[in-house]
């Protein structure tokens, strides 16, 4: 619907699929009656009967064909809504997780680190290799091994690299190579500090 004018209040549920900033404005215009559902991992539950179905993966037209089920998080205002959302979600996926709002917020933040920031790091690496005329295929095995460790939950124990080794000579050389990219340089410094802090004995 482009507008809630003339909305049928006898509907069982209304699925609000808009940007996060618009969700609660749209829900405020929906007449009382139907259960209200949104799809944001970061926003609170509706202030009326309903809930959240959050797909823990970006949905894009070019990735419509999936080799694995789309994981869905369910959070609801009450048991009745939770059951209804479960029935709806099962039409989409067999991989469901029931998380309360606090857990969902934590999961969303973890997803930003695991996916959004990770993807941005890959984009930086791809741009840097393009600028230095390196073939991206050089790094396929390295990236595959990194993600295999992540799937096993072993990322911390498998950490390698100059930051981990406190290799000052290499770190300084890398920072010198990033002088033309000040944002990347600051990110490099921050990531180096984070790695070294995480692996400093208590």
Identify the meaning behind each predicted range:
Residues 1-65:
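Rossmann-like NAD(P)(H) cofactor-binding subdomain of soluble oxidoreductases
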Residues 10, 29-33, 91, 131-132, ...:
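Alpha-helix C-cap/termination motif
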Residues 15-20, 36-40, 50-59, 72, ...:
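Long, contiguous hydrophobic alpha-helical segments, chiefly transmembrane helices and signal peptides
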Residues 20, 53, 79, 115, ...:
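Electropositive phosphate-/nucleotide-binding environments in soluble metabolic enzymes
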Residues 25-26, 84, 173:
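Phosphate- and divalent-cation-binding pockets in alpha/beta enzyme and binding domains
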Residues 37, 42, 48, 56-65, ...:
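Predominantly flavin-linked oxidoreductase catalytic cores and closely associated redox partners
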Residues 64-152, 198:
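Internal alpha-helical scaffold of NAD(P)-dependent oxidoreductase catalytic cores
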Residues 144-202:
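Interdomain hinge/lid region at the active-site interface
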């Amino acid at each position: 619907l482009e507008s809630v004018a003339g909305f049928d209040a006898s509907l069982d549920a209304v699925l609000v699929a808009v940007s996060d900033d618009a969700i609660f404005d749209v829900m405020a215009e929906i007449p009382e009656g139907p259960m209200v559902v949104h799809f944001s991992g970061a926003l609170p539950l509706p202030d009326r009967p309903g809930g959240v179905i959050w797909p823990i993966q970006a949905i894009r037209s070019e990735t419509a064909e999936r080799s694995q089920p789309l994981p869905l998080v369910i959070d609801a205002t009450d048991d009745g809504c939770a059951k209804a959302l479960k029935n709806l979600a099962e039409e989409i996926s067999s991989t469901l997780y029931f998380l309360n709002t606090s857990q969902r917020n934590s999961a969303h933040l973890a997803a930003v680190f695991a996916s959004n920031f990770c993807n941005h790091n890959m984009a930086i690496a791809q741009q840097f290799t393009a600028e230095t005329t390196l073939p991206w295929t050089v790094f396929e095995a390295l990236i595959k091994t990194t993600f295999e460790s992540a799937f096993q939950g072993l990322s911390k124990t498998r950490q390698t690299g100059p930051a981990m080794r406190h290799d000052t000579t290499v770190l300084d050389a890398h920072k010198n190579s990033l002088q033309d990219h000040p944002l990347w340089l600051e990110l490099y410094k921050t990531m180096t500090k984070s790695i070294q802090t995480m692996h400093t004995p208590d």
